[in-house]
């Protein structure tokens, strides 16, 4: 099932966080009661796992939703989405993936190498869900989209649904035609290649093109991220994430829970973002996944939080029975 971009609106109801969230989702109409919820209501908690600890912010009460960011980022990437989900009636756990943000460094990878693999992140996700008393729906961005696939396939009793935002789930192939013809893809690949040398400057330059439009707090959020990445050891941890997504790709046929893939049509990481999302869905069992597109870049949860949160809440309300709010 494909949800066209035209069906996604920047709903004033989501922005308002008042008493009702009315959504129109194709043939479905959903109204969810909510309460005012601010970022200041979050509680920070550190979850001790084998090999390290994961920093989490916890918002709200209700069915559990776990948020996980992408590489070279931190949990503040979901600063606008997490309160919206909590306001819609969910208990939201927003985690820093291993080596990032306030989570500990120097974890031992299941690969035996100095990397942070998708399987590593998936195992951390499952550990966090157990700690908070799952099951849960996982919302994963980029590398964490691939990790969500693995978690769903390997721990189906704990993962009742997955949302993958611009995921690196499939084995990637460099597109020569895309590099020649698609300017945003060319810009993204050049900057990513330079950032892979461990250059914070080039990573920030990549982020500048990865956002198709800038949220109002873009400068402040980038300054906060840069400050985190300048901490001793953080860039080295970031560089450990440059591993193959083969482990996630191989698990796509084993996903049994409902899945939503959200692609930004202006994402510079893919020559054709919509085709990438379609390929992720097609590798899952029939009827499992659906695709939605938003006119935005790689960081939809920061760039287009209203549309992104709306899609997630619709998915939870209409596709995941365990997430129904009564």
Task: Tell where the protein language model's regions lie, with residue ranges.
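Conserved alpha/beta-hydrolase catalytic His-Asp/Glu region
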Residues: 173-174, 195-254
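An N-terminal hydrophobic leader/cap segment in hydrolases
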Residues: 15-46
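Flexible "cap/lid" loop of the alpha/beta hydrolase fold
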Residues: 153, 161-193
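Short glycine-enriched nucleophile-adjacent loop
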Residues: 145-156, 162
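Conserved loop-alpha-helix segment in the C-terminal half of the alpha/beta-hydrolase fold
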Residues: 256, 260-296
């Amino acid at each position: 099932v494909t949800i066209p971009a035209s069906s996604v609106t920047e709903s004033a109801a989501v922005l308002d966080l008042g008493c009702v969230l009315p959504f129109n989702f194709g043939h479905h109409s959903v109204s969810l009661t909510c309460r005012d919820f601010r970022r200041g209501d979050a509680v920070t908690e550190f979850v001790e796992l084998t090999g390290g600890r994961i920093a989490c912010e916890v918002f709200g009460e209700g069915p559990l939703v776990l948020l996980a960011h992408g590489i070279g980022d931190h949990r503040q990437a979901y600063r606008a989405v997490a309160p919206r989900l909590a306001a819609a009636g969910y208990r939201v756990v927003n985690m820093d993936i291993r080596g990032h943000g306030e989570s500990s460094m120097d974890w031992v990878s299941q690969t035996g190498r100095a990397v942070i693999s998708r399987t590593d992140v998936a195992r951390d996700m499952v550990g966090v869900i157990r700690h908070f008393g799952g099951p849960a729906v996982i919302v994963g961005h980029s590398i964490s989209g691939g990790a969500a696939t693995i978690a769903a396939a390997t721990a189906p009793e704990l993962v009742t649904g997955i949302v993958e935002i611009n995921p690196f789930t499939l084995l990637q192939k460099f597109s020569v035609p895309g590099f020649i013809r698609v300017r945003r893809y060319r810009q993204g690949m050049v900057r990513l290649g330079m950032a892979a040398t461990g250059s914070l400057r080039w990573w920030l330059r990549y982020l500048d093109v990865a956002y198709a439009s800038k949220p109002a707090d873009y400068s402040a959020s980038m300054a906060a991220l840069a400050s985190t990445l300048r901490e001793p050891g953080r860039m080295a941890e970031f560089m450990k994430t440059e591993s193959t997504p083969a482990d996630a790709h191989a698990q796509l046929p084993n996903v049994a829970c409902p899945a939503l893939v959200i692609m930004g049509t202006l994402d510079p990481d893919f020559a054709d973002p919509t085709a990438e999302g379609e390929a992720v869905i097609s590798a899952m069992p029939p009827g499992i996944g659906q695709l939605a597109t938003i006119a935005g870049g790689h960081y939809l949860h920061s760039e287009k939080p209203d549309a992104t949160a709306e899609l997630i809440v619709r998915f939870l309300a209409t596709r995941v029975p365990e997430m129904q709010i009564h």
